[in-house]
């Protein structure tokens, strides 16, 4: 790890925080940043988790203060997510790097579809939301499954959670977003613990990236661009395409 690594990672992680604050999907930029810098995939995932924990902690606290997290619904989902992410992280560390890259290659088109699709989600008013036993079960199941994915890889986790909580658990977008923040914090913490235990986190780089990520998030939230999501979508798709090409070149090389 040298100065060039920091020069590649930090600006992109800053952009990731900025993008995430405006329209979500920052992880689609932050993890590729580590991979572009030539960091091994498992270490890249672990270090990305380290910097992501800071951003998700701030976001979760902010949503909680605004009353956007239903604690009774979030708690079982958070517990399920914690277990799922731990499983996913351990699976990631046991997988050969080549297999992990192949899995990423298969996941990327689906993530790109979610980023591009504008009509997948349906908003619901608070009156339309009916939190029943089914809601608790589907929310916990979603959290567990996405938790495994987040521990295994990560980018797009927030998007997956919002989609599942909206479509499967039938929560409104505002409520789904709030629950997703709490669940995502749990998945990040759980998987980070596993990666730290196995020594696959570059602490100096992670700290620098965390500062850049939080600064980007602060500026992005402050600007609050009305057309932010529309402007960000092409950037996310470009990053996905570049990462797709990067992984193919690694597999062929």
Predicted region positions:
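Selective hydrophobic functional segments
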Residues: 46-106, 188-238
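Residue-level signature of the transmembrane alpha-helical core
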Residues: 10, 14, 18, 49, ...
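Transmembrane helix-loop junction
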Residues: 36, 43, 89, 93, ...
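Selected transmembrane alpha-helices and immediately adjacent juxtamembrane segments
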Residues: 1-40, 126-177
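Hydrophobic alpha-helical transmembrane segments in multi-pass integral membrane proteins
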Residues: 145-153, 191-199, 206, 243-253
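Small-residue hotspots at the loop-to-helix junctions and early N-terminal turns
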Residues: 42-46, 177-181
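Transmembrane helix exit motif
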Residues: 58-68, 89, 105-131, 244-253
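Helix-loop junctions at the membrane-solvent interface of multi-pass transporters
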Residues: 22, 65, 94-95, 117-118, ...
């Amino acid at each position: 790890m040298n100065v060039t690594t920091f020069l590649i990672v930090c600006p992109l992680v800053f952009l990731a925080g900025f993008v995430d604050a405006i329209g979500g999907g920052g992880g689609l930029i932050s993890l590729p940043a580590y991979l572009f810098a030539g960091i091994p995939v498992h270490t890249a995932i672990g270090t990305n988790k380290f910097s992501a924990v800071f951003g998700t902690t701030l976001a979760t606290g902010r949503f909680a203060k605004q009353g956007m997290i239903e604690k009774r619904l979030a708690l079982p989902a958070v517990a399920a997510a914690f277990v799922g992410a731990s499983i996913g992280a351990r699976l990631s560390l046991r997988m050969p790097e080549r297999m992990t890259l192949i899995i990423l290659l298969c996941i990327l088109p689906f993530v790109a579809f979610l980023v591009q699709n504008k009509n997948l989600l349906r908003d619901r008013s608070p009156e339309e939301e009916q939190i029943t036993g089914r809601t608790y079960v589907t929310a916990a199941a979603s959290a567990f499954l996405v938790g495994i994915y987040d521990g295994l890889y990560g980018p797009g986790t927030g998007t997956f959670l919002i989609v599942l909580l909206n479509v499967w658990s039938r929560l409104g977008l505002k409520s789904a977003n709030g629950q997703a923040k709490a669940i995502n914090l749990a998945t990040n913490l759980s998987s980070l613990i596993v990666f730290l235990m196995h020594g696959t986190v570059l602490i100096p780089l992670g700290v620098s990236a965390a500062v850049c990520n939080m600064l980007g998030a602060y500026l992005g939230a402050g600007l609050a661009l009305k057309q932010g999501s529309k402007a960000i979508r092409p950037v996310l798709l470009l990053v996905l395409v570049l990462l797709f090409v990067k992984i193919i070149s690694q597999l062929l090389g």
